[in-house]
Design a protein with these regions (language model features):
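A short helix-loop
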Residues: 1-88, 170, 174-186
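Short glycine-/acidic-enriched loop or helix-start segments at secondary-structure transitions
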Residues: 3-6, 133-135, 161
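Short, conserved micro-motifs enriched in small and acidic residues
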Residues: 21, 96-99, 155-160
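A contiguous, well-structured pocket-lining segment that forms one wall/lid of small-molecule binding clefts
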Residues: 46-122, 131-145, 192-204
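Conserved phosphate-binding/catalytic loops in two-lobed NTP-binding clefts
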Residues: 121-122, 139-164
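Active-site metal-binding loops of divalent metal-dependent hydrolases
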Residues: 127-128, 154
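Glycine-rich phosphate-binding/hydrolytic loop that grips phosphoryl groups
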Residues: 152-190
């Protein structure tokens, strides 16, 4: 999970990243813990639809702090403890987990928007962008911030090939091409100048 300022094709400034577990991983681990099946994101979203999002007291890691980054390891651990306690149903726990994630995403994104000089739109993409509750919350944030909200169709949110292909098409149109002599890179930071952060988020 990253917040990026897009300055042009291939030109990004990283505003925030995940210092431990990615949000998608937190969804997958929650689904596995509750036996909801795979893929975890849609399974959690379906179960959460029938639960009370305010029923289980779960943490909002880093929310309200000056640190702009994300952290979901503590939330994941709290879900485990809550489930092991036997006090809550799967529906209430998934709904509360999803709401905690939403609160963190909205809080961190608001900080990023406020840190930018003149943002022109709020764009959300990737697998978690297929979650309707998350999309709605970020769309509300965009409206509050006076920004257009942009998101791909749901069926494209989890299609990595489409994302890579579109990025390649944009680079080709901008004349940003490479020959086949460059070596493979297992990790390719979107912002090579971004500072490393504490925790495991150095993957960038």
């Amino acid at each position: 999970c990253q917040l990026l300022e897009v300055r042009g094709v291939g030109a990004y400034r990283r505003l925030a990243t995940t210092i431990d577990d990615a949000v998608g991983e937190a969804f997958d681990k929650t689904a596995k813990l509750l036996g909801l099946g795979h893929p975890g994101g849609p399974a959690v979203e379906r179960m959460a639809a029938s639960g009370n999002p305010r029923s289980v007291p779960l943490p909002r890691p880093l929310a309200g702090s000056a640190d702009p980054n994300f952290s979901f390891a503590g939330l994941k651990s709290a879900v485990l403890r809550a489930w092991q306690s036997g006090q809550w149903s799967a529906a209430d726990l998934t709904a509360s987990f999803q709401q905690a994630v939403i609160d963190c995403l909205v809080d961190r994104t608001r900080i990023a928007i406020e840190a930018m000089e003149s943002p022109s739109a709020l764009v959300v993409a990737g697998g978690v962008a297929s979650n309707q509750a998350i999309r709605a919350a970020l769309a509300d944030l965009a409206a509050q911030s006076g920004l257009p909200f942009v998101a791909p169709p749901l069926w494209l949110c989890t299609d990595n090939a489409a994302m890579i292909g579109w990025a390649g098409a944009e680079r080709l149109a901008a004349g940003l091409t490479d020959d086949l002599s460059f070596p493979a890179r297992p990790r390719w930071p979107l912002d090579p100048d971004a500072q490393k952060v504490r925790g495991a988020g150095v993957k960038a």
